[in-house]
Amino acid sequence: DDGVPMSYHELFWKSELVDFVILQQDAFDDIDALCPIERQSYMLEMVLDICDKDYTFENYEECRNFFKEVINLLRQMNYSEFQSEKFENYKQQLTNLLSNGN
């Protein structure tokens, strides 16, 4: 991984973010299996905003860990009722991560 520019790693993890949060749905989860257009639009805008930002990472592991945490929080939002207390809690955690992060 040291031979690849950090920008490639960042781009890769941004594509993983889109894949895991937007393109994949969990058919076994009652909430994620059926996603209304309003929620899809909301989540897509959030993901695109994250992907539009430039980040600074010291190394590949930092980049990977950051995006894995972002993906996890967004997936937890996908499993929560839209705009519920649980959903908003995950959103706040994500906001904190993004503001404290890179």
Task: Go through the PLM ranges and name each one.
Residues 1-102:
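Conserved catalytic/coupling modules of large nucleotide/cofactor-utilizing molecular machines
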